[in-house]
Each structure stands twice: as structure tokens, then as C-alpha cells.
Amino acid sequence: MDRATGEPVEGSPLRALDIRPRFEEFHFIDVDRGKLDVLRAAVGDRADVFLYNEDANEALLRIIPTVKYSEFKRALCVLDPYGLDVDWKVLVAAAKQKTIEIFFNFSIMDINRNILRHDRDTVSQKQYNRMMRAWGDGSWEQELFSRDESLFGYLEKVDNWTVAKAFQKRLHDVAGFTCVPEPVAMKNSKKADLYYWFFASQNSTGAKIAKDIFKHYTQVGG
């Protein structure tokens, strides 16, 4: 709903369908069947729309190889997970394909709440495994904690921006994206960081457009 008028506002899937020039195909993935049912009712029997009610990582690892450079295919992938749920393998696969540009909401809130705790013994094995899956390896254990101990003997976590910069570097150096501009922090009403909005591509033109979008978002008070 629009906060000012109270009128319904189109969600991002329906807005994507209205983009001109239009994409040849649209692939929407969500584990929430109810959301997909609403979208299915809105799009009807359009042959260019594909809906997947499953884990997005599994679906993307099937879709990405079909976007072939040799067939002059290109794709824009928007990753907006519920939390720290994107598998690093998906990002690596997209980078290797060289045909896919990505916007990605990286959940710093989830990391701070569940993984980067002062007392690391309180981090469950499940949460530890989620971080390993999202980061791709165990390097985060060295990169995201300072070497200085607190008064209570715990290693202090680095600040949010340092976490974001470390992930930016991984997208470039490890995953293999050529162009990874500095991300933008997405904040709540109390100005606390929720996500970092990343763009990753093999295309400098796409990166320039992303930088302009990020700059505009920052200037209007994001």
C-alpha cells in the first residue's frame, strides 16, 4: 500500500513484467506457495512467465546454465532472500556463465543476529553451516572478527561496512565478477543496517547504471 494515498502498489514482479523493452522470459522463485498463487492469478497464462515453488538455490542452479553466451542470451537476476539463504555456489555459477548481472540483498542483520556473536560458543551448528554456505568457505572466521579481545575475552566483530567490503572483494576476487561497485546499506526507520544492496556483473556498462541507481537511492535519503 502507498503510505501517502493508501492505494495498492504493484510489487516488483508485476513491475518487472511491465518493463520496456521487455525481457523474453521471466522466472520467479519463492518457497511461499501463497505468494506464487497470487502472482499466478495476476499473470494468467502468459507463456513467457515461469514460476517455481522451491528453494531458489536449486532452481537457479538449473536455470543459470541455460543462459548461454554462445546463444547471445543475457539475464538480470534479482536475489532478495528472506535472510542469509543464498548459496555461494549460485553466485559462482552466475559469474562463470558471463551472461548474468545480479542485484543481491545481502542480509547483514541476519549475520549480526545469528553468527557474529561476541561469544562464538553460542552460535548453533545450523547457523554456522548457513554462514559457511553463504560465504563459500571458512575465511569469514578470520576476516569478520578483529584480532583484539574485549574486556570479557571475546574477539570483537568488525563493523558492518567492513563485512560488506569483505563480501564485495569475494564477489570480485573469488566468484569472478569483473565489476562489483560498492554496495549500498538498506536501513530501517531507525537507521539500522538491514541489508547491503550489491550489484555484480561482467559488464562495465551495467555497473555504471547500478552506481547511478545506488547514488540516487543515497541522495533521496536511503
Residue ranges and their predicted role:
Residues 1-222:
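Class I S-adenosyl-L-methionine-dependent methyltransferase catalytic core
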